[in-house]
Structures are given as C-alpha cells and as structure tokens.
C-alpha cells in the first residue's frame, strides 16, 4: 500500500462531497491501516446518513474494540440502516463486551416483546424487533468466523442458544415482524452445535406459515444431523412449493 493512497483517502474522508466521504472510509477499512481507524470513527457522527452507514460498516471491517461505545450509540441513530450496520459491526468485533451486547439485543434487554407494560420496574426502553433480528444474524456470522467465541467457547454457544430460543418462544405465529426475528434466530441456530431442545423447537417451526421460517428451519435441521427430522422433511419434499421441495430433498440427502 502506498503512502500516497492513504493520504488521499484521509483527505477524502473530510471532503465536502458525502459520497466521497463514504467511499473514503470504506477504502480506509479495505487497506486496514491503523491510521485510518480514527478518521473512520469520526465519520460515524457525520450529518449524512449514507456516510454514517459506510462508517459503521467500515468499523466492522476494522474490528477494533475502540469503536464499541460509538457503535452502541449508533444503535439509537435516526436512520434504521445506520442502526443495522452498527449492530453488524459489533458482531465483527472479537471481544466479550461486543458479544454481550448482541445477546442483550436478541434478548430485548431482558424485557418482554410487548414492551414496557409487562417490563420490570425501572425499565426504560426495548429494542426494535428489526434490530433484534439483525443482532441474531450477527451472532450467526460471528459463529462462522474461525477462532471466534461462538466457534470455540461452549459457554458463549450456550448463552447464544438460550437467547435465540427465548426469542423464538415469544412467537405465536402469524406476526410478520416477529417472524423476521424467528427466521434470523433459526438461521443462526443452524450455525451452532445442536441439542435435543433446539432440534425440537426447529422441528415445530416446519409447520409455520412464513416461508423463510420454514426454509431456515430446513437448513438448520440438515446441519443438526438429527434423524428425527427425516419424516417431517420427507413430507415437505412433497410440498407444492418448489423451493421448499428442493430444500427438503437436499436436507434429506445430507441426513441419509
């Protein structure tokens, strides 16, 4: 990497053109020079949504724990896309507190999905279902990173599993918004080692009315390798839905 390129990107990060600033922080993350971290962090507070979105993604690429507080603050950003990118970035930071924050998000801060009405005394806010779904997905991506806590720590795996199963337990079917959280939770469970409880929960979701809940459930069951899934998957292999038929057939091939 040339010094000239670094200097150019550092200058562009302060450019009057928002698109230039956004491209600059992504460029700084790509070259991974430590000198690019601080300017990227500053741009997370840019007045333009597009720039903040890029900065959040870039900070995830850097994976530097010094961005933790700013990214947590970004979860309250006025832009939902910035919130989403900040949560994704937290999933890329390989430290215990970033993992803890993702668990907190998936778990709704320990509060019920219904909000404050049934919340413990002193509770002030809940996380949006969309952000909880993003956090659930971020856990799955984290589990795919070689050497990460979710790839190596039994304690972290169990904490994630409990949070994801509890999120699924809030779902009574029919709620489109919660279905997105369930889909994300099942997708991530498919990246974790299975146990009988998880397999049972996912098997029940094969009958859900939302296609993506069913799709990710099929994929997770194929990963789990539990032969209890064979019979229900054989039924889905006869589904009228072509995509479901193909997924179920592929899962059966993996289980046989």
Q: Language-model features: where?
A:
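Amphipathic alpha-helical scaffolding segments comprising HEAT/armadillo-like alpha-solenoid repeats
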Residues: 2-12, 33-45, 64-76, 95-120, ...
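Short inter-helical turns and helix N-cap capping residues of alpha-solenoid HEAT/ARM repeat scaffolds
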Residues: 16-17, 47-48, 78-79, 109-110, ...
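Residue-level detector of extended alpha-helical repeat arrays and alpha-solenoid scaffolds
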Residues: 21, 52, 83, 132, ...
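Helix-start/N-cap signature of alpha-helical segments
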Residues: 124-131, 153, 174-181
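Eukaryotic acidic, Ser/Thr-rich intrinsically disordered low-complexity regions
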Residues: 234-256
